[in-house]
C-alpha cells in the first residue's frame, strides 16, 4: 500500500523544517506546517475577539492584533492561559489539516504534515509517522539562532511540549543533529520502507 500521507512530528528545534524541505524537494510531497496554520488563526478577527474575552489587554496591540512577544511570554509563564488558548486554536488547526488531508487523498497526492503538537486523532489520519529528534543542546541553539529566543525561553518551550510521549507512535525515528546528507539518507531509508 502506498503511504501518501505522512505525519512529521518532533519537538521545537528538532529539525522538522529541514525534513519537510527535503520531502518537498527530493520526494515531491506537498507540505503543511501546522504552526503556520495556527499563526493564520491569530490573524483572524473572530478568533482574536475570542482571545480578548479572557486574555489580559497587555498581550494586544492598540490595533487589536496580538503583541506576539507579550503573548508568548504569557503562555510560557501561565499554563492556565496556555491551555485556554490551545482549546481554541488546536481544533481550528486540526480541522484545516484534516480538510487538506482529505483533499490530498481525493486527488491522489502526497502530503507531509508537520506538527510539534500531535494528538492520537491526527496521527490516525496519517499513513505513516516520522518522528524527528535532535539532542537538546542543538535544539536550544537552533531556537536561539533562528527564532531569537533566549536559552531559557527555548528550554521552557521545549519542556512544555511533552512530544517524546509520541515517539513510540512513530514508524521511523530520524536523528537530525544537523548533517543534511545524513538526514537525506535517513529519509531515503524511510521512504523505501513505507
Regions found by a protein language model. Name each.
Residues 29-43:
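Short beta-strand-centered segment that lines the nucleotide-binding/catalytic pocket of NTP-utilizing
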Residues 40-107:
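ATP-dependent small-molecule kinase phosphotransfer cores
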Residues 124-125, 145-194:
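Small-molecule kinase domains that catalyze NTP-dependent phosphoryl transfer to phosphate-bearing small molecules
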Residues 17:
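Walker A/P-loop
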Residues 98-106, 110-146:
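ATP-dependent NMP and nucleoside kinases share a basic, alpha-helical "lid"
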Residues 6-8:
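Hydrophobic anchor at the beta1->P-loop junction of P-loop NTPases
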Residues 14:
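ATP-binding Walker
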